[in-house]
Amino acid sequence: MGSYFSLKNSDLHPSCIALPRSAEEVSKAVRTLSLGAHKWEGQCQFGVRGGGHTPFKGAASTDNGIVLDLLHMPSAGISPDYETITVSPSTTWDLVYEVLDAHNRSTLGTKVAGIGVGGASTSCGVSYFSPRYGYICDMVENWEVVLATGDIVNANANENADLWKALRGGINNFGIVTAVTLKAFEQGPFWGGQTFHSIETRQEHFKNHAKLASAHPYDPYAHYINTLVLANGGHWFIGNSIQYTKSDPPVAEPEVFKPFLKTERTPIFPGLPEDTLRVDNVTSFSREYAANTLYPQRWQFACISFAPDADFMETFFQMANDAMQQYVKLPGFKLILNYQPAPTVQLERNGAVDSLGPIQTEGNVVFVHWAVSYDESEAQFDDAITKSVQDLFHAANTKAKELGIYRHFIQPTYADSWQSPFDYRSKSTIEELVATSKKYDPLQVFQKQVPGGFKLPQI
């Protein structure tokens, strides 16, 4: 259990962990568990683990039930024409990139190495290439799925198309995905890296960020995250992620990032670099970003969104600082506050077929990926920290609404258990998802027996 990204999952004690090595073995397990629940109502609870990165307790585990760990599921690999790649849900994105980089190809995947394909592809993960191509789920050409009956089916644009659409953003509500086939596209090395700054420069970053996030049209090659880190003891620093994904040839220091590069850079510690800017491949960038993340620790994610506004970025920073000061001396404490632009071109997703529905239509968005971590020894602070974050987000949303800059959107891969992504989707989208769930899972096994993840609303 200590292999999960967040040690909150170690609080749960499954009765058994199964490690299937094929879709057929997953099928046997699901059929047995489904029959058991039919005979003993409320029993035979199970969790499904792909990469095990979702941090909240029970997302991919269960207490006194069964965990189906997909760690040993096989991957078919890249197709002969290099147009697709088929991998298991437990494959981490950096391994996918490593295969594709060798052929100057890529796909949409997470920006951080070590995260499994399954969760990010069935939800609404964001990529370095999302302004050009949309969300990770929109790259899935085919799902191999084990249904509650134990049947193994393919879901794609021509076969079980409604299930294909539902799984593109519908999370774990329809079956167990045992293989994911992703579209690949031409992509060579590109320019990017991290830049480090003192916290006193933050308002320069906020102004540049708001200008970039408000841009119409948005440069689809521009990827940027403004990251502010509150470290143990109360020291803040800034470590931004900048990528310009145009390749063949790559463009160093493109015009869109010139204002950002004028801000004074400062190493986090003496002897460290002030930036890591270079031309490199996506495998390298993802592993660099992952190296900044300590685990195993206890982690909490959350997400909040608003219109691009430099003043509100400062307001939220001050509110976050005030809310977390009481915890900064906890062993291992760290707050990572990521401001990320979500331009209209990304939200519209090139008209992709998925189950996200119409995402808010009020223009470009800035969303916050909130991540707090601390050592396992401080587990007694879980509830207090969660309550502090909930109070902070409620106050921030209230303030944003007063200013007319609230945006009804959260990024599902960054949401905590109290933030259901389905609350942010349209009524018609939810009705379609529920209908698909009842069609492929008439006994609602994945609603009743699999408590982890985000369940569909009852309508």
From Swiss-Prot:
Residues 10-187 form the FAD-binding PCMH-type domain. InterPro entries: FAD-bd_PCMH (IPR016166), FAD-bd_PCMH-like_sf (IPR036318), FAD-bd_PCMH_sub2 (IPR016169), FAD-linked_Oxidoreductase (IPR050416), Oxid_FAD_bind_N (IPR006094). Pathway: Mycotoxin biosynthesis. PROSITE patterns: FAD_PCMH. The keyword Oxidoreductase applies. Its EC number is 1.-.-.-. Keywords: FAD, Flavoprotein, Oxidoreductase. FAD-dependent monooxygenase; part of the gene cluster that mediates the biosynthesis of cercosporin, a light-activated, non-host-selective toxin. The perylenequinone chromophore of cercosporin absorbs light energy to attain an electronically-activated triplet state and produces active oxygen species such as the hydroxyl radical, superoxide, hydrogen peroxide or singlet oxygen upon reaction with oxygen molecules. These reactive oxygen species cause damage to various cellular components including lipids, proteins and nucleic acids. Belongs to the oxygen-dependent FAD-linked oxidoreductase family. This is FAD-dependent monooxygenase CTB5. The gene is CTB5.
